[in-house]
């Protein structure tokens, strides 16, 4: 047995033995996030990949980092996060070890007071951690995350209301509707729905609830973007709706220039269905009177007759 004097001769050796092995992430040739050290990835999971000068970071890593203040206005820095503060947070995170991958650079800590778990955002998502995108933007490890009382027996037997595929047997991958208790969704399906519809159109797919449903989804870690719906941001997404129907749908078209041609007045004027507007006919092709401006297609005629 070594004496006390002999032990004191090798303090470094003793410290090396007691210290857990920590590995550094390999450097990537592609730009990586300063706060999680990973590449851009899926924006629905990690948010927009922001780049300014030589600074690259996921938007979600910015807003979820445990000690990163937002000091600037939204138009300054990266959404109000100043470059010097981001770099300072990266230095702090470089001393924290992710409990999932055992590598340094973990900027997010579980918000439970008794928990000391730190993790990279992508690692935490893979291990069932949950982050909330409202208020204080808190994050939790799997043990301390908010939960729902989902009946375990139904998992794997029932299907997701949105994609109609079987639910996962892992409960953290499913979310139950607060207003339609029988409706259970895949987390990834709800997140995709929220990412597309955004704040102003996000509602319960079953009953259109716009209050209780979004609040519960936020509590359960769904990110609901505060912007217009995706389909409203796409240029010309509804351009076809502004185009007038230009085709004769009569069983036999009599116009010598064809179904897609017509005149502004007279026998070959194109009359659109007065109910749906998505079918048309030349006056002569449906034996309409010379001054007739109203006509209904075969699909709408039975409905109008019944009413």
From Swiss-Prot:
Enzyme class: transferase
Residues at which Zn(2+) 2 binds: 98, 101, 120, 123
Primary location group: nucleus
Impact upon substituting residue 231 to A: Reduces interaction with UBE2D2
Record flagged with keyword Signal: no
Binding annotation for Zn(2+) 6: 248, 253, 282, 285
Outcome (variant: residue 270 to A): Reduces ubiquitination of histone H3
SUPFAM superfamilies in UniProt: FYVE/PHD zinc finger
ZnF (C2HC pre-PHD-type) intervals: 30-68
Pathway terms, separated by semicolons: Protein modification; protein ubiquitination
Consequence when changing residue 242 to A: Reduces interaction with UBE2D2
Binding site for Zn(2+) 3: 110, 115, 141, 144
Pfam families associated with the record: zf-HC5HC2H (PF13771)
Keywords: Metal-binding, Nucleus, Transferase, Ubl conjugation pathway, Zinc, Zinc-finger
UniProt note on tissues of expression: Expressed in Leydig cells and in developing spermatids (at protein level). Highly expressed in Sertoli cells in testis.
Region Required for interaction and ubiquitination of the nucleosome core particle, residue ranges: 67-92
Known outcome of mutating residue 238 to A: Reduces interaction with UBE2D2
Name the record gives this protein: E3 ubiquitin-protein ligase PHF7
Organismal lineage: Eukaryota, Metazoa, Chordata, Craniata, Vertebrata
